[in-house]
Amino acid sequence: MVYSQLQALKRNYYLDWLRNLHKGKPKTFAITFMGVKQICTIEGENLKAIQATNFKDFGLEPMRRKTKGAMPFADKGISTTDGKNWEFARFLVKPFFYREVYASIDRVDPYVRKLFGLLPEEDGVTFDIQPLIQRWFLDLTSEFIFGKTMDSMTYPDRANITWTMLDVLRGGRLRIQMYKFLWAFNWNWWLKAVYEVHDFVNVHIRSTYKELAAREQRIRDGLPVGPERVDLLWYMATHVRDEEELRSQLCLVFVPNNDTTSIFISNCIWHLARDHEAWQKLRKEVLDYGDQPITFESLRSMPYLNGVLNETHRLTPNNIVQVRACLNDSVLPLGGGPDGKSPLYVNKGDLVSVTKTVMYRDPDIWGPDVDVFRPERFFGVRGNWNFLPFGGGPRRCPAQMMVQTESAYMLFQLAKRYSRLECRDPEPYTAVMRIGPSNINGVKIAFYK
């Protein structure tokens, strides 16, 4: 099984591999993976148990920190720890929850306008929009995290760190999954990428510490100081004064976060380009809105726009599998008994894996057209544990509202600007695994005004 999984990742059929793993089996079943019992499930109630009702019984640290799978890239951070260490890491990302950040259209708009300046001026020109969206998001997120944009849309070479971070993520995923064989996954290319990212982040950390020390000295001397920085690094640096610890905390936010929204928006466009009717419905909703000011609330009130976002999350979720280690003997509400409807006992040390890419295509939940892109299926649907793209409970993704706002605004402006969107790549979606699935051929399209 280890070999088949590695081959699936290497040859870019990992999503099919996961679906085949579940094919013909109950909705909750157990396997043995590298000598550890792993409970695989697509039951929303079981996801609720590990993320909310029995939250304290399940965690990440045994898989990610104690195994040293993420080292030397990072040690303590929001995605590697449990308990008090996790609570502190969660506290350090508090700026993600500031409404003035996640609800701000003014923060996003200048970057969207700049991206539009890079799109082909003539109608019908074939191009790949995915790398442009990656540069757009790098510029947007670097301002929020470091207080200064990288401006890779003006200087494309500055986006090279993005590809380095992708190497870190790809290697890190394998090392964490195959933690018992770390000696076989200590590649020079991965270590080189890790140290390049460290060098990049260290420059920002040291500059911030220097600026912070100068500010604190002026305050002690009774001298005036200017407005305080409001970026994430500044906030973190005021609470963590050890450079190595701060780098670990920051890397576990910056590196995974750098890939999420750009992949998601690219996937949205990939689906829309293959559905002329969906693009026209989205455009009609946008044009019907008129010239009113666009706000966080107005974006959230558009049913078709949000249906597009949710349907993209469903068909191509960024978080395809959520795995938790059982920290204390516990119980899942479903999976036991002959019919799988009774509680299931979980021993300390077992793993529970919720395969979202299979759950989100379960005909019992979504009907017979599970493989069809149909945003209307979300009209009037309230959130539930069968569909939580950003997770739930205390470990819900802190960037949820920010991702939704940035993505909705980008699609709104594209639909307003272009009357037609055409697919220029007939090949099916072939997922390369990064932080989430990304199409191997990019997103080749053409716009018409």
Curated annotation (Swiss-Prot):
PROSITE patterns: CYTOCHROME_P450. It is found in: Membrane. It catalyses: (3E,5S)-3-[(2E,4E,8S,10E,12Z)-1-hydroxy-4,8-dimethyltetradeca-2,4,10,12-tetraen-1-ylidene]-5-[(4-hydroxyphenyl)methyl]pyrrolidine-2,4-dione + reduced [NADPH--hemoprotein reductase] + O2 = 3-[(2E,4E,8S,10E,12Z)-4,8-dimethyltetradeca-2,4,10,12-tetraenoyl]-4-hydroxy-5-(4-hydroxyphenyl)-1,2-dihydropyridin-2-one + oxidized [NADPH--hemoprotein reductase] + 2 H2O. Keywords: Heme, Iron, Membrane, Metal-binding, Monooxygenase, Oxidoreductase, Transmembrane, Transmembrane helix. Its main location: membrane. One of its GO terms (molecular function) is heme binding. InterPro entries: Cyt_P450 (IPR001128), Cyt_P450_CS (IPR017972), Cyt_P450_E_CYP52_ascomycetes (IPR002974), Cyt_P450_E_CYP52_fungi (IPR047146), Cyt_P450_sf (IPR036396). The keyword Hydrolase does not apply. Gene3D superfamilies: Cytochrome P450. Cytochrome P450 monooxygenase; part of the gene cluster that mediates the biosynthesis of ilicicolin H, a 4-hydroxy-2-pyridonealkaloid that has potent and broad antifungal activities by inhibiting the mitochondrial respiration chain. IliC catalyzes the ring expansion of the tetramate intermediate to the acyclic 2-pyridone intermediate that contains the trans bis-diene chain. The biosynthesis of ilicicolin H starts with formation of the tetramic acid by the hybrid PKS-NRPS synthetase iliA with the partnering trans-enoyl reductase iliB since iliA lacks a designated enoylreductase (ER) domain. Belongs to the cytochrome P450 family. This is Cytochrome P450 monooxygenase iliC. The lineage of its organism: Eukaryota, Fungi, Dikarya, Ascomycota, Pezizomycotina. The gene is iliC.
